[in-house]
């Protein structure tokens, strides 16, 4: 095979007389002439493998062409490849043309003017026979595949040819049938043409006859007219002749001799006149003669009578034809008159039908409009039904989730109950071992001291037995009211039996005290038992009920007994040595009493300093708890009992008792104890309302969704619902009798019982603890904690520095520390236009712009830049339960006054947060708070609305939900736009505008004491 390029062969065949270098330069010039086309069309990554195989490019050149940053686009890389090949000389040119011949044959034809032959000269020179053999095998495989595809195509074409042959046979048969039909059609066409020619001939003959008849009729008419003219002329001549004769006669008669000179003068004139008359008479005579001669000649002609007869026949024929045509015209006229009458009847009929159709058309149009309106109404109702269905599905899913959570909680409670039973059994075992120890001590004391010490040990043994047999779990502390709060010390028999029944119900079925063991069994157990028994605690017990209650097993155990009476010989050292004394004494024991007066047989001065007398109240359902002192426990101070129990004292005692029932080394304290001021103000308002029965309704707002209860009369209270208090001491239990109030019309919806303030706090605290513990147990607890911003409060004994560092950590920590189940609210009807606050804060600027872009929105809204009021950062008080201080800044009052001045004109769109809303309400400005719900379903639309594609969905959700935590602490009502109420940004702006207009006409519920006084533009509803 030859090793030169195809371009050189083409030039040699063309017979160009220049040398190889001139030819090469000429071809490179041709390549440079179409360089722009080559750089745009060629792919260097496709050409470099073949050029590397031809050894005109090395690895460095390939890397420079394909991987360098100097040539960002493909055109630059192709140009650099052409420059490198031109530097390689003739070999580069030949390899470039062969590559074009293989991969770009159209550009090879453009450069050389030849069709690509795909020869392999360069491969043979560079790679040798092996490379060529491999290349040829590749080509053979390609040709075989092409041959197979060609054979397959031939088979397809043959099958198609057979189908076409069958189709051709069918078409030939149809062609023969069409030819026969065409022959028949040709014969019919010839017959038709012959008949047409005969018809034309007959029409021509008829036309000639008609023309002849018309000519004869014209000749007849002209002859008749001529005869009439001649007859008229004859008559005129005759008349003229007779007139002239009469004149001549008169002239002759009047002729006489001329009278003198006048007659002589008139004689020439008369002679002239006479000559003229004579000449005229001669002329007339001559003309008459000529006429007579012509008449005679006419009369004397032989064919005159026949022509007149012919003319008469023609005239008669014409008359008859005229009669016939007249008759036909009359008939046609009659027919036309009948058709006209029929057409008029049809016109009247059609006009009547047109009027009926018009009436039907109008009726149908009205029916169509009615049906359109009905369809629009039905579609709107369907949309509402779909929304209600979605809401029902969501509520069903939520209820199912709550039910599953309740099942999980039930399982957790069962596990805790089993753990507590195990702990109780271990405690009973410990008490039994203590009893064995005491029995040993009794035996030793009996041998050494005698019977007196034995009696003391026996009394101690009986007291410990009573104490060990009366441990029980109290889920709900019973309220003190009526006979329990005001009864005598001893109590009545029905009350005692009822309390005993309650005690029997609350005693666990396994808490049965075994009989005291003998001395031998005690010694044997001491040898067999481990000297260090396991330590257990009641920490889980407080998580379930919030308190551990010790109820009296016998009437002999007094509620005012001191801790010294429990241990008459002092605290035994053996109990502390066995490892369970400290853990046991660190637990507080709450003893339920039947009255606040001391029982009979004991004087008030016999009370120990550790006892804590108190009084419950009927509002909170608090009971008096007695705290047993021990190592590590705080000493309670003596409180002076008041004459009448108030809600504040009962709440304080209940809170203190609840706090002391918790372990002191636990990592969290009760959050509701830190908001004593809110509890104090709430109970003061409740007492004031109870003392005045004719006062205004007592409205409260549920700040949280309370857990559902098994009581059939209990109300299922959701967050932000308004309740009206009816009976604060319903059946003397820890619950209120309330009615759910419609927030728009103030009408009562349904009635039932709800937990009172302290009971609701306990339920919320237990629920919060369970949620926190479930978050800690889940593998993603830290991630959820960061996403939801939950921060546990520090222990009560922690340092001030630690608490100060942790309190401002997350925005919801303040809400957790002020766990208020209810808030005292009042309805207000604001007549002036209220300002608008949009939440979350990151959506407020964009939503404000979209609201202002809506048509006619600038007539209702305006932007009031409040500069975030600079006072919304509230000062955090040092004490956890202390009230928050409002910062007094110089510019705050002026900005609020600016907002108040613009309230009466338009709705002010404010870019404020939840804390700014507190300042506005404090300044007697009640804004409309609109919160847009952000969920995983609409977070992408929210991100597109903000125009920040770089944000992650989790970051946006965390920011929006962080602002959502502040909503539950607002002192006024707010409205939320759910995620299913809108689909895109424009619809969101319309929905927000509609909610603003709706909220303007509604009542606003404001917390009592949140503002300085009643506003001038608002009134009590």
Curated annotation (Swiss-Prot):
Residues 23-115 form the CARD domain. The keyword S-adenosyl-L-methionine does not apply. Disruption phenotype: Deletion mice show impaired tissue repairing. In addition, more infiltration of inflammatory cells was found in deletion mice compared with control mice. Residues 138-450 form a coiled coil. Residues 495-508, 525-535 have a biased composition (Basic and acidic residues). Keywords: Coiled coil, Phosphoprotein. InterPro entries: CARD (IPR001315), CARD_CARD10 (IPR042140), DEATH-like_dom_sf (IPR011029), P-loop_NTPase (IPR027417). One of its GO terms (biological process) is activation of NF-kappaB-inducing kinase activity. The modification Phosphoserine is found at residue 18. Residues 1-24, 475-544, 597-616, 790-809 are annotated as: Disordered. Highly expressed in kidney, heart followed by brain, lung, liver, skeletal muscle and testis. Gene3D superfamilies: Death Domain, Fas, P-loop containing nucleotide triphosphate hydrolases, SH3 Domains. Scaffold protein that plays an important role in mediating the activation of NF-kappa-B via BCL10 or EGFR. CARD10 and BCL10 bind to each other by CARD-CARD interaction. They both participate in a complex with MALT1, where MALT1 binds to BCL10. Interacts with TMEM43; this interaction is essential for EGFR-mediated NF-kappa-B activation. This is Caspase recruitment domain-containing protein 10. It comes from Mus musculus. The lineage of its organism: Eukaryota, Metazoa, Chordata, Craniata, Vertebrata. The gene is Card10.
């Amino acid at each position: 095979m030859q090793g030169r390029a195809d371009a050189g062969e083409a030039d040699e065949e063309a017979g160009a007389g220049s040398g190889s270098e001139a030819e090469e330069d000429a071809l490179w010039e041709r390549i440079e002439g179409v360089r722009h086309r080559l750089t745009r069309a060629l792919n260097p990554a496709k050409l470099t493998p073949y050029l590397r195989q031809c050894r005109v490019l090395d690895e460095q050149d390939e890397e420079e062409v394909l991987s360098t940053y100097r040539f960002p686009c493909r055109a630059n890389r192709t140009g650099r490849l052409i420059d490198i090949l031109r530097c390689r000389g003739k070999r580069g040119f030949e390899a470039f043309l062969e590559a074009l011949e293989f991969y770009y044959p159209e550009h090879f034809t453009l450069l050389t003017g030849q069709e690509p032959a795909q020869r392999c000269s360069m491969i043979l020179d560079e790679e040798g026979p092996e490379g060529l053999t491999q290349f040829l095998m590749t080509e053979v495989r390609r040709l075989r595949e092409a041959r197979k595809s060609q054979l397959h195509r031939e088979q397809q074409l043959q099958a198609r040819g057979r189908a076409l042959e069958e189709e051709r046979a069918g078409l030939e048969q149809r062609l023969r049938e069409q030819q026969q039909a065409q022959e028949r059609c040709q014969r019919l066409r010839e017959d038709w043409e012959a008949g047409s020619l005969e018809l034309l001939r007959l029409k021509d003959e008829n036309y000639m006859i008609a023309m002849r008849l018309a000519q004869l009729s014209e000749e007849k008419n002209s002859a008749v007219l001529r005869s009439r003219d001649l007859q008229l002329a004859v008559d005129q001549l005759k008349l003229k002749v007779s007139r002239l004769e009469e004149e001549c006669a008169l002239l002759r008669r009047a002729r006489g001799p001329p009278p003198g000179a006048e007659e002589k003068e008139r004689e020439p004139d008369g002679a002239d006149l006479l000559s003229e008359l004579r000449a005229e008479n001669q002329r007339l005579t001559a003309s008459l003669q000529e006429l007579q001669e012509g008449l005679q000649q006419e009369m004397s002609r032989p064919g005159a009578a026949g022509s007149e007869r012919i003319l008469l026949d023609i005239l008669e024929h014409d008359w008859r034809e005229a009669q016939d045509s007249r008759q036909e015209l009359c008939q046609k006229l009659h027919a036309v008159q009948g058709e006209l009458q029929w057409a008029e009847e049809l016109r009247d009929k059609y006009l009547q039908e047109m009027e009926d159709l018009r009436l039907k058309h109008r009726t149908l149009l009205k029916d169509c409009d009615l049906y359109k309106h009905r369809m629009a109404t039905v579609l709107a109702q369907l949309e509402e039904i779909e929304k209600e269905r979605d809401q029902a599905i969501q509520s069903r899913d939520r209820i199912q989730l709550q039910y599953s959570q309740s099942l999980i909680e039930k399982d957790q409670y069962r596990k805790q109950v089993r753990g507590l039973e195990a702990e109780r059994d271990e405690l009973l075992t410990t008490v039994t071992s203590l009893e064995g120890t005491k029995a040993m001590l009794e035996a030793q004391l009996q041998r050494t001291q005698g019977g007196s010490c034995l009696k003391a040990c026996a009394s101690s043994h009986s007291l410990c037995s009573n104490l060990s047999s009366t441990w029980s779990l109290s889920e709900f502390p019973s309220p003190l009211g009526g006979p329990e709060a005001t009864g005598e010390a001893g109590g009545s028999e029905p009350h005692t039996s009822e309390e005993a029944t309650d005690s029997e119900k609350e005693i666990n079925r396994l808490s049965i005290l075994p009989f005291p063991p003998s001395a031998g069994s005690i010694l044997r157990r001491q040898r067999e038992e481990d000297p260090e028994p396991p330590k257990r605690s009641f920490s889980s017990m407080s998580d379930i009920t919030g308190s551990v209650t010790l109820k009296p097993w016998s009437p002999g155990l007094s509620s005012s007994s001191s801790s010294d009476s429990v241990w008459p010989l002092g605290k035994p050292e053996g109990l502390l040595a066995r490892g369970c004394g400290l853990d046991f004494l660190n637990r507080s024991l709450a003893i339920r009493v039947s009255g606040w007066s001391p029982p009979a047989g004991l004087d008030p001065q016999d009370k120990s300093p550790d006892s804590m007398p108190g009084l419950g109240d009927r509002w909170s359902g608090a009971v008096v708890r007695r705290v047993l002192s021990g190592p590590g426990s705080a000493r309670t101070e003596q409180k002076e009992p008041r004459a009448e129990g108030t809600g504040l004292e009962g709440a304080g005692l209940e809170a203190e008792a609840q706090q002391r029932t918790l372990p002191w080394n636990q990592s969290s304290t009760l959050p509701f104890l830190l908001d004593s001021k809110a509890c104090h103000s709430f109970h003061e308002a409740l007492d004031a309302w109870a003392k005045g029965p004719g006062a205004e309704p007592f409205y409260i707002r549920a700040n949280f969704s309370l857990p559902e209860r098994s009581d059939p009369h209990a109300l299922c209270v959701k967050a932000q619902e308004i309740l009206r208090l009816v009976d604060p001491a319903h059946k003397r239990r820890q619950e209120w009798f309330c009615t759910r109030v419609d927030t728009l019309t103030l009408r009562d919806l349904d009635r039932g019982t709800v937990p009172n303030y302290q009971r609701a706090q306990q339920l919320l605290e237990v629920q919060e603890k369970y949620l926190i513990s479930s978050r800690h147990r889940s593998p993603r607890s830290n991630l959820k904690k960061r996403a939801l911003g939950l921060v546990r409060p520090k222990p009560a004994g922690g340092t001030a520095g630690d608490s100060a560092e942790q309190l401002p950590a997350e925005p919801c920590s303040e809400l957790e520390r002020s766990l208020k189940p209810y808030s005292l609210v009042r309805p207000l009807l604001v007549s002036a236009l209220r300002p608008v606050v949009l939440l979350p804060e990151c959506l407020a600027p964009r939503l404000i712009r979209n609201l202002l872009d809506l048509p006619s929105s600038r007539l209702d809204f305006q932007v009031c830049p409040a500069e975030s009021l600079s006072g919304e950062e509230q000062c955090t008080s040092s004490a956890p339960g202390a009230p928050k201080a409002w910062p007094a800044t110089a510019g705050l009052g002026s900005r609020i006054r600016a907002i108040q001045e613009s309230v009466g004109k338009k709705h002010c769109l404010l870019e404020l947060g939840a804390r700014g809303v507190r300042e506005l309400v404090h300044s007697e400005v009640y804004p409309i708070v609109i919160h847009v719900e952000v969920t995983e379903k609409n977070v992408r639309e929210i991100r597109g609305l903000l125009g920040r594609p770089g944000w992650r969905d989790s970051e946006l959700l965390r920011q929006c939900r962080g602002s959502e935590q502040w909503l539950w602490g607002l002192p006024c009502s707010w409205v939320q736009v759910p995620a299913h109420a809108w689909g895109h940004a424009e619809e969101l702006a319309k929905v927000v505008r509609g909610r603003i207009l709706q909220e303007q006409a509604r009542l606003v519920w404001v917390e009592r004491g949140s503002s300085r006084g009643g506003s001038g533009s608002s009134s009590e509803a």
